Amino acid sequence: MRMSLAQRVLLTWLFTLLFLIMLVLKLDEKAPWNWFLIFIPVWIFDTILLVLLIVKMAGRCKSGFDPRHGSHNIKKKAWYLIAMLLKLAFCLALCAKLEQFTTMNLSYVFIPLWALLAGALTELGYNVFFVRD
């Protein structure tokens, strides 16, 4: 299962455009939709990315794969998986807060996002300062 760059770009633009249109309609009070419905394009896009990532990670389990050539690659894929799950947790917490399902403090809603940004900053610093290939 492989997507070309043009397909990935088109898919990203399509889901982003759909999400932004739905968000504008909700914020202008033209559509009385639930916040969970507004985020459906984001979740569909994330699901596609998660499936592609899991398929790539499962490909490492096939016979004939040489584990000496890619231990760094599996760590990167694991980080991508954790990042996607943190983004999903943030979106779910944000929707729950906006729908007033919970009386959670707003700073608790942003904990997954802060963890995601801290991890991204750590990976960026590691790639800039320590990886010299």
Swiss-Prot record:
UniProt KW keywords: Membrane, Transmembrane, Transmembrane helix
Pfam families for this protein: Tmemb_185A (PF10269)
GO cellular component, one term: membrane
Superkingdom: Eukaryota
Repressor found in the keyword field: no
InterPro entries linked to this entry: TM_Fragile-X-F-assoc (IPR019396)
Coiled-coil stretches: none
Subcellular location: Membrane
Membrane spanning stretches: 5-25, 35-55, 78-98, 110-130
Keyword Phosphoprotein annotated: no
Topological type in the membrane: Multi-pass membrane protein
PANTHER family membership: FAM11A, B PROTEIN (PTHR13568), TRANSMEMBRANE PROTEIN 60 (PTHR13568:SF4)
Protein name as catalogued: Transmembrane protein 60
Organism: Homo sapiens
